[in-house]
Amino acid sequence: MIYWKKRLLCLLFSLTLRRQSKTIYNMKKIILFSAILFWAVFSASAQNKNAQVVTWTTAIQKVEPHNLPPAPYLEGNSLRQIVEVSFGGNMVSLKLSNQYNTEETEIIGVELAKALTQGESAAIDESTTTALTFGGAKGITMKPGEIVVSDPVKFRMTPRMDVAITIHFGKASRTDVSGHPGSRTSSYIAEGNTNDFSKAVETTHWCYINSLIVNAGKKFGSIAVIGNSITDGRGTTTNHQNRWTDNLSKRLLANKKTKNLSVLNLGLGGNCVLRGGLGPTANSRFDRDVINQEGVKYAIVFEGVNDLGGSWNGEETAKQLIESFKTMIKKAHEKGIKIYGATIMPFKGNNYYNESREKGRQQVNEWIRNSGEYDGVIDFDAATRDPQQPDRLNPAFLFENDWLHPNADGYKVMGDCIDLKLFEK
């Protein structure tokens, strides 16, 4: 009897140990699963918190001979360029482009600082000067065609702040430059590797700078605007930042529902959609300048007038433009980007005008307004045309009587006519 009692006790003890062992094993699985789940949530949260969004950018092209940097040129010298950001941030990276160069460009050093005079001078708040690094190094040599991004650095930017980007060059070509001719903002070239710009030479072009990228939260995003000289700001006031995109940016920042959106001006003077024109066509650069920009949530397409202005058959060109716009819309939607079409403004009085080209303009605008292909419409035509003669610009908005580009008042009307609800979705 005692024997069987002992056997029974041993059996019960063994079962208890197995249950405890199984419980411990299950607890380990629960703890491991919880740890994995926590890591995944934390990682996703960190990625959202540190999502990269562009707060300023420009469209890069091969700089034409008449827009190249003046003497003393860039090699061995320092270049200070001023840009105005949309929203601010505390962790910033700079993208530089050597995309159209056939030679190497040597960068000895780069600094960011707060600019003090909106580009009217090279003055900076020296206490804000922050050196950038590239893979931990002070400088970098960009290979032909290369685009590089600096390491993120702590640098406080506030909304609409003017940032001075100072580049110290080693080897740099005089005639082979990637940049943006229509900066509408002053830049300054000083001799030598220096931060003394008191005797600097002033120019109004950007060279090599491409984007300022902010580590921002998931609530932040950007509106990429692809366009021609009317987006680039032909007719605005140098250093006043009064393009229509600037006005839109100010309105967005003042609206609680849209204050976390940057406006990226990717206009190029003389740009075409289909072929010819200045710089890469809108068709060829759409991926680079819109789809692949960090943080893009919305896009605006405002192109076509230069294609029509150089066409032999306005209605045939209109058909080709519409097909190109359909392709852009498809690409944007595949990336989850809402895309809006802007109507082509009138140009009677300019040498672009003839009846065939006007018919083409009306054809494109009719499609933009009524096809339903775009996610929304921005009607610049209606906002800027002469009420008495709708095939020409309102005379109050003329720049130098060219009957193509608006003046500062016209650009303000353009920025004001855009419904901000398009960007509250």
Residue ranges and their predicted role:
Residues 100, 172, 229-233, 268-273, ...:
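Solvent-exposed loop/turn segments at secondary-structure junctions
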